[in-house]
Swiss-Prot record:
Catalytic activity, reaction form: a 6-O-methyl-2'-deoxyguanosine in DNA + L-cysteinyl-[protein] = S-methyl-L-cysteinyl-[protein] + a 2'-deoxyguanosine in DNA; a 4-O-methyl-thymidine in DNA + L-cysteinyl-[protein] = a thymidine in DNA + S-methyl-L-cysteinyl-[protein]
Name of the protein in question: Methylated-DNA--protein-cysteine methyltransferase
Transmembrane annotation, as ranges: none
Annotated function: Involved in the cellular defense against the biological effects of O6-methylguanine (O6-MeG) and O4-methylthymine (O4-MeT) in DNA. Repairs the methylated nucleobase in DNA by stoichiometrically transferring the methyl group to a cysteine residue in the enzyme. This is a suicide reaction: the enzyme is irreversibly inactivated.
Organism from which the protein derives: Thermococcus gammatolerans (strain DSM 15229 / JCM 11827 / EJ3)
Signal peptide (UniProt feature, chain positions): none
Keyword Isomerase: no
Family: Belongs to the MGMT family.
Gene3D superfamilies: Methylated DNA-protein cysteine methyltransferase domain, Winged helix-like DNA-binding domain superfamily/Winged helix DNA-binding domain
EC number: 2.1.1.63
């Protein structure tokens, strides 16, 4: 199922889309409805490629409100973890997502290298897991930055900057 809702955040429209079946299978967001729908199609294709059964039949859900509450800091990321299905996620990716969500709190960032060191893996492996994160906002991949600057973000640099600034992050260099 798919739930889509528009919220106002800091004078901006934020469209949140959640694919779910029992629990959250994937999340996306965008500044426009059209952009969100394109991202949802891409997310559904990604999930299906990982053998996740996805339906894009629209159905209202409290999951969009849950993601919004995490986005604005009303609910801690970690508290939303039980709502994620982790379907189609590898054991390594799940370990990265859970560690990041539990240890890198709102208003802080971590470098790819520091995250890799904490998990005893390589920065490249961490970067790959961040790129494949189907749960942005709840699993705060936007808080992972490069030593030289903001780094990459699958949904776009403008979106990453927006999220970091919303959380009060002023500097994002390691």
């Amino acid at each position: 199922m798919l739930a889509v809702e528009r919220f106002g955040v800091n004078g901006r429209d934020i469209w949140i889309g959640v694919i779910f079946h029992g629990r959250i299978q994937g999340i996306s967001f965008a500044f426009t409805r059209g952009e969100l729908l394109e991202r949802i199609r891409n997310l559904a294709e990604f999930l299906r490629g990982r053998d996740v059964r996805v339906s894009l039949d629209v159905q209202p859900s409290n999951y969009t409100e849950l993601v919004y509450r995490v986005l604005i800091g009303e609910l801690e990321n970690e508290k939303a973890l039980p709502e994620l299905s982790f379907e189609g996620v590898t054991p390594f990716e799940r370990r990265v997502y859970e560690w990041l969500t539990k240890n890198v709190k709102r208003g802080t960032v971590i470098t790819y290298g520091s995250l890799a060191k904490a998990l005893e893996t390589s920065p490249r492996a961490v970067g790959g897991a961040m790129k494949r994160n189907p749960y942005p906002i709840i699993v705060p991949c936007h808080r992972v930055v490069s030593r030289e600057g903001i780094g990459h973000y699958n949904l776009g640099i403008e979106e990453k900057k927006f999220l970091l600034e919303l959380e009060g992050v002023k500097e994002w260099t390691g």
